[in-house]
Amino acid sequence: MSLTLLTLAMILTAYLAGSISSAVLVCRLRGLPDPRSQGSGNPGATNVLRIGGASAAAMVLLFDMLKGAVPAYVAFRLGVDAVSLGVIAIAACLGHIFPIFFKFKGGKGVATAFGAMAPIGADLSLALIATWVIVVLICRYSSLAAIVTALLAPAYTWYFDERFTVPVAMLSLLIIIRHKENIHRLLKGEESKVSRKKRTDGN
């Protein structure tokens, strides 16, 4: 198989893997309400935290990260170039955001994007996690934490391993675009903060 065909196959595989909505499946297995119709209506870890608590949210977070990490890592090991790696990672995120198996109603893609970046290195992963946690602790906005982390991710990547700056920048742009409604609410002071009891929409 040529590298071009391999890349196309990986893009399709990444999208299909991303289309498996772990939030919906975990909620079904746990007997919880459908996250698409409860809380923020967003099938992501933050909304599952509100609906079902920390353990359910942790499962969703792990599975969503794997949807990005596995295709990106496999493609890297197969010798796919950096820009194509970015496209494959974006395909996984687009599967999460617009899942073909769940009527194209998905989440924000934050955990999947992080999963795709994680194989670059533990130092980058720790920097991204630390940034997200610090912003959440300061302001309690999951969406703002995701946006700030996405903005800083290319700079972190350039510092730790500049080979992957372009694909990470591609992922960051997708995350920021996906959060445009959150940005509008933040500017208006209408965004919900992280809470298990209040409406949240940042993940």
UniProtKB/Swiss-Prot annotation:
InterPro entries: G3P_acylTferase_PlsY. It catalyses: an acyl phosphate + sn-glycerol 3-phosphate = a 1-acyl-sn-glycero-3-phosphate + phosphate. Coiled coil: none annotated. One of its GO terms (biological process) is phospholipid biosynthetic process. Keywords: Cell inner membrane, Cell membrane, Lipid biosynthesis, Lipid metabolism, Membrane, Phospholipid biosynthesis, Phospholipid metabolism, Transferase, Transmembrane, Transmembrane helix. Its EC number is 2.3.1.275. Pathway: Lipid metabolism; phospholipid metabolism. The chain crosses the membrane at residues 6-26, 56-76, 82-102, 118-138, 141-161. It is a multi-pass membrane protein. It is found in: Cell inner membrane. Probably interacts with PlsX. Belongs to the PlsY family. Catalyzes the transfer of an acyl group from acyl-phosphate (acyl-PO(4)) to glycerol-3-phosphate (G3P) to form lysophosphatidic acid (LPA). This enzyme utilizes acyl-phosphate as fatty acyl donor, but not acyl-CoA or acyl-ACP. This is Glycerol-3-phosphate acyltransferase. It comes from Shewanella loihica (strain ATCC BAA-1088 / PV-4). The lineage of its organism: Bacteria, Pseudomonadati, Pseudomonadota, Gammaproteobacteria, Alteromonadales. The gene is plsY.
